[in-house]
Structures are given as C-alpha cells and as structure tokens.
C-alpha cells in the first residue's frame, strides 16, 4: 500500500475526512473552558484540549470500528469502512489506537493530577462504549457520558476542581448528545434491526420524535441553568434562542423518518453547538 493510499485509509478510519464528530465534541469543551475561566481560558490548557479532542475522537472512531467490524459490512452506511472492507488489519488499527491514546495521555500529563485521573476514566469509557450496542438498547445514553467527559476535565484543568456549574453543562450536553445521536441512529435503524445492533432509535420506536424532543427540551433547560449559574447575559440568551431554532428545524427534518433528512438533522447539530459557543463567547467579550 503506497503512502497516499495508506493516508486515505487512515483518514477514513479516524474520520479526519468527516469532522462533524470532532466539532460536536469541541463546542461543549470550549464552552466548559470559557465558563471555568470566566472568559478566555489559559492558552496552554486551550491548545491541549483542542488537540486532545481531535485525537480522542479519532481513538473513539477506531475502537468503534474495531468493535463493529463484523457487523458494519451488513449496514449500508458503514460497509465501506476500512476494517469492515478489509483495507486495514485489526492489528494495525489497534496499534494506531494505542499510539493515539498514549499521545492524548501524554498531553494530559502536562496538566494537574485531577485532570490525569479524570482522563483515565475517559479512556476507559471510550473503550467500553462501542460494546454497549450489543448489550443495551440505550448506547446513546452511554455515549452521552463519553462525549460529555471533557467538561469536568476542562473545569479541573482550569480551576483544579469540578463545581456544580460544570455538572449543569455536563447534563445539558448529555441530553443533547442522546437527542442528536438518536437522529443518527434513525438513519441505520432498518439495518441495525437486521444485524442485532441496539439503539435508542429502536427502543423509542414510533415515539422517537417525541422523546428526542423531550431530550432537546431537557438540554435547553440545563444549558440555561449552566448560563444562569455563571451569571451569563443577553448574548448567551441569543445563543440559546438560536439553539432552539435549530432544534425546531431538526424536528421538521426527522418528521417522516427518512434516512437522508435524519442524517441532515444530525449534521445540523454542529450549527446548534456553534450558536451556543458563539453566544457564550460574545457574552464574555462584549
């Protein structure tokens, strides 16, 4: 395999070619750093967390594809993934996972002891998540914990502690993650039923849109609580209102439960997260 071909395989394995997951991880992480710092976070901490988010998202994709390698070939959206298609060996994928994981851990060692301890838990959660799809109908709820774990880590890095304010943001992001990843699971629902992969899209059944809406409302309430506990003002409120607008649009997209619109609704959450981040940043700057 030549270098260009290997890069193509690695970029698809780690989803470098599809940054949506990285962005969905990044917005709440940056919000946590800003809230913890009361504005602009420490530059060293900021750089470490941005790089760490990119690396850990890649790690999560690798271990997810490793866990699903025997099933992905039966799912329309995933059958061309490198492990499922045999373009890369499981050994090579696991070696890359270890290298990236150690790189992320090396970055964390530049921070305080509490962050290091939390990072160990985060790595364990990342490894466990893909296998929850085999044993529970609620893997999205476990994913919500994994994808929110950078929030207490960000507070710990910036302040040396994890106050109640952090857990409001954690709860908001957990609810939001369950909502948008259920939209994502709606895309694969028919294939997942055939191969035995479990998801909240299957669990919620005909009430999927309504329950997603409840999680969106819960996320909204917790985002408001996080802002209130940090004394945020009008511009953050405008970010919240924009988030509501995007959430409403997503409900319209998933109304008929068709694959393409459901995937579009999932992707639209990037803009919802960006709106919250920009609103919070503007509230501190202006």
From Swiss-Prot:
GO-annotated biological processes: ubiquinone biosynthetic process
GO cellular component terms, semicolon-separated: plasma membrane
Catalysed reaction, written as an equation: all-trans-octaprenyl diphosphate + 4-hydroxybenzoate = 4-hydroxy-3-(all-trans-octaprenyl)benzoate + diphosphate
Keyword Cytoplasm: no
Disulphide-bonded residues: none
Gene3D superfamilies in alphabetical order: UbiA prenyltransferase (1.20.120.1780)
Record keyword Cell membrane present: yes
InterPro entries given in the database record: HB_polyprenyltransferase-like, Prenyltransferase, UbiA_prenyltransferase, UbiA_prenylTrfase_CS, UbiA_sf
Compartment(s) of residence: Cell inner membrane
Membrane topology, as annotated: Multi-pass membrane protein
Enzyme class: transferase
Functional pathway: Cofactor biosynthesis; ubiquinone biosynthesis
Cofactor: Mg(2+)
Transmembrane parts of this sequence: 21-40, 95-115, 142-162, 167-187, 210-230, 235-255, 266-286
Main location: membrane
Family matches, as PROSITE patterns: UBIA
GO function terms (MF aspect): 4-hydroxybenzoate polyprenyltransferase activity
Keywords in alphabetical order: Cell inner membrane, Cell membrane, Magnesium, Membrane, Transferase, Transmembrane, Transmembrane helix, Ubiquinone biosynthesis
Coiled-coil ranges per UniProt: none
PANTHER family per the UniProt record, alphabetical: 4-HYDROXYBENZOATE POLYPRENYLTRANSFERASE, MITOCHONDRIAL, PRENYLTRANSFERASES
HAMAP family to which the protein is assigned, alphabetical: UbiA
Assigned protein family: Belongs to the UbiA prenyltransferase family.
Protein name as annotated: 4-hydroxybenzoate octaprenyltransferase
Organism: Shewanella baltica (strain OS155 / ATCC BAA-1091)
Gene for this chain: ubiA
